[in-house]
């Protein structure tokens, strides 16, 4: 495996499950990661923090963790802080990058300040006068819009709003998941894309063409009719520029090692970054394995390469 001795990893916990709205996705990701690591000869074991205390990791001699948790405390810096406390190396971003990366509202504030293009948006707080806010938002941003809880992943509770009358019900639904809701102008005309990041690997950008309105939870993890275009149809020079911009969007949030940066193109080819993902899904529907396969890297090789990023100083 690329010159890496699987014994160099020591005893590895694959963190999976957890207690967020994305538990089932995490279980699916984690089981595949576990199988891939074991097939490569890594001494790896499943560990569900919703069922066992994290202190057991230290007590049972784990020295490294592959974080396959999605959303909630698995992705918002809490697990990362606990692993730092116990001295256990782990995949993905640290506390700051994880916390910022899961928070769409604060991500967009950082990007705006640093000139990373992102769709125009407004933030709505739980308890606001939704009717008054909706009227002002439609007047300012127009339609269609996307309504997103600030800190849920896998497109949980993301709603596309096409009419002014639909915005208030969408806000009422989204605030069930988070006290801050992002209402974002929908970027139309050029499609949805993702740039996968894994150390220094040069992975291709993927164009995502869902059968439905947008790349929602169903399209990501259930449907078989979502199309993934590799190559993505962007000219090589422009794709290289967008990869560099995606890496910058990832880095300025304090994110490290591996993840994804998702963006839209408008009808003129301008990119608008939507969010990053610091603990991407690793199911058979997920994007990083697809990008890796396109350049000849198997699932097993990918999970070992990601885990190997924990060996660096």
Swiss-Prot record:
Pathway of action: Cell wall biogenesis; peptidoglycan biosynthesis
InterPro entries given in the database record: ATP-grasp, ATP_grasp_subdomain_1, D-Ala_lig_Van_CS, D_ala_D_ala, Dala_Dala_lig_C, Dala_Dala_lig_N, PreATP-grasp_dom_sf
SUPFAM superfamilies noted in UniProt: Glutathione synthetase ATP-binding domain-like, PreATP-grasp domain
Leading EC class: ligase
UniProt similarity note: Belongs to the D-alanine--D-alanine ligase family.
PANTHER family from the UniProt entry: D-ALANINE--D-ALANINE LIGASE (PTHR23132), D-ALANINE--D-ALANINE LIGASE B (PTHR23132:SF23)
Protein name stated in the entry: D-alanine--D-alanine ligase
Organism field: Paraburkholderia phymatum (strain DSM 17167 / CIP 108236 / LMG 21445 / STM815)
Recorded name of the encoding gene: ddl
């Amino acid at each position: 495996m690329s010159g890496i001795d699987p014994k160099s990893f020591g005893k590895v916990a694959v963190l999976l499950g957890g207690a967020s709205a994305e538990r089932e996705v995490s279980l699916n990701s984690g089981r595949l990661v576990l199988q891939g690591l074991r097939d490569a000869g890594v001494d790896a074991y499943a560990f569900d923090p919703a069922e066992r205390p994290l202190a057991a990791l230290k007590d049972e001699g784990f020295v490294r963790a592959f974080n396959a948790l999605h959303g909630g405390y698995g992705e918002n810096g809490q697990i990362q802080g606990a692993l730092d406390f116990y001295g256990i190396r782990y995949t993905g971003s640290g506390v700051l990058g994880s916390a910022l990366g899961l928070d769409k509202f604060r991500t967009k504030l950082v990007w705006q300040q640093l000139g990373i293009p992102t769709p125009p948006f407004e933030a709505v707080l739980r308890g606001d006068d939704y009717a008054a806010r909706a009227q002002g938002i439609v007047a300012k941003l127009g339609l269609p819009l996307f309504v997103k809880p600030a800190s849920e992943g896998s497109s949980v509770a993301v709603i596309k709003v096409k009419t002014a009358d639909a915005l208030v019900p969408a806000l009422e639904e989204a605030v069930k998941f988070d006290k801050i809701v992002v209402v974002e102008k929908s970027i139309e005309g050029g499609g949805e894309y993702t740039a996968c990041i894994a150390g220094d690997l040069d992975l291709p950008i993927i164009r995502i063409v869902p059968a439905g309105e947008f790349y929602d939870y169903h399209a990501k993890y259930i449907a078989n009719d979502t199309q993934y275009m590799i190559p993505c149809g962007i000219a090589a020079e422009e794709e290289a520029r967008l990869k560099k911009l995606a890496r910058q969007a990832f880095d300025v949030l304090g994110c490290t090692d591996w993840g994804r940066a998702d963006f839209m193109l408008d009808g003129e080819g301008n990119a608008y970054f939507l969010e990053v993902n610091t603990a991407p899904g690793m199911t058979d529907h997920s994007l990083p394995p697809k990008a890796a396969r396109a350049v000849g890297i198997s699932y097993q090789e990918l999970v070992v390469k990601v885990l190997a990023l924990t060996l660096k100083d």
